[in-house]
From Swiss-Prot:
Any one GO CC term of the record: plasma membrane
Topological relation to the membrane, as annotated: Lipid-anchor
Signal peptide: 1-24
Lipid addition sites, S-diacylglycerol cysteine: 25
Major subcellular site: membrane
Family label: Belongs to the membrane fusion protein (MFP) (TC 8.A.1) family.
InterPro entries on file: CusB-like_dom_1 (IPR043602), CusB_D23 (IPR032317), MFP_Efflux (IPR051160), RND_pump_MFP (IPR006143)
Protein localization: Cell inner membrane
Gene3D superfamilies: 2.40.30.170, 2.40.420.20, 2.40.50.100, Helix hairpin bin
Record's keyword terms, sorted: Cell inner membrane, Cell membrane, Lipoprotein, Membrane, Palmitate, Signal
Protein name per the record: Membrane fusion protein MtrC
Tree of life domain: Bacteria
Biased composition (Polar residues): 388-403
Amino acid sequence: MAFYASKAMRAAALAAAVALALSSCGKGGDAAQGGQPAGREAPAPVVGVVTVHPQTVALTVELPGRLESLRTADVRAQVGGIIQKRLFQEGSYVRAGQPLYQIDSSTYEAGLESARAQLATAQATLAKADADLARYKPLVSADAISKQEYDAAVTAKRSAEASVKAAQAAIKSAGINLNRSRITAPISGFIGQSKVSEGTLLNAGDTTVLATIRQTNPMYVNVTQSASEVMKLRRQIAEGKLLAADGAIAVGIKFDDGTVYPEKGRLLFADPTVDESTGQITLRAAVSNDQNILMPGLYVRVLMDQVAADNAFIVPQQAVTRGAKDTVMIVNAQGGMEPREVTVAQQQGTNWIVTSGLKDGDKVVVEGISIAGMTGAKKVTPKEWAPSENQAAAPQAGVQTASEAKPASEAK
């Protein structure tokens, strides 16, 4: 950024301004003794300032994470046979129930016809048993046949009824196997590379994965964090300091090249157990993937609001001189400039979040320090500074901006 490139110049200008502010009284006395008219004093230069007020700001942590599909399904064959045709395009989106492979179905078609023939035979046997029983019933009443013969006819009918039910079940089983010869998608999602080609022989019960389908909208992102930080996060949630409008913690995603994913995600849950070997807890968030930008397995940086800082101040980056001790220049009540040591917590777009060193209503100098230092003016004229369009549009996605931050008075 530009303010880093001119850091040495800013430091020199700040030192000059401080020295002039400290020596202005002595120089003014010397000028009076030399007979210099008061009207010859240099006019007060205009400096750009921002009047700061305390706010409640969520400090964001950046954690490593990995993207994971919402659902993943491996496609396998449930019946054996030779693959005759692949019915999908690799890498395409498929819907649940869509045909993916066709296995040679001739054997299963024959099995279904055989089961139907068995049903016809069983039904014919049942019809004969019904007719025999109908003839035997009046005969046994007249003692024309023995009771044993009648009981045998009853048993034959029941056996024929069971044979019909078995044949019906065989038809159903043969139909299931025939349907399974056409392998369909178990879930909707993007299907990857086919692991088999036409002509491959599959055996019944084979565990070979034919292809994998991944459901990628929304996507999961898994993050690990120390147990102590997660406990702190839970306290913040319990106090209501980090809840978003929908009652969930918002998370952002940043890629390796530094770009930030435009969609915000939401924290779903924290694993209830701590990894004994690392002392870490796994957190899971969900994020929309309507444009299919996110890919399963991709490593990302997760931006997550972790701590709500009360009485924090949002200060433009160019107003802060970074060093062993971070400082800003303040316009005091007498109209002069004075340095103030501050504590910078973290970056927020083109601003710094300052957690100590400032007070409500302080006028922090953003522009004009160099001019004031060169002119040797004892006083300056503060003017509210407005950022340029580029600076106003720069706050980082996934991090709360100053305009979104809640004033500390409202947070309480």
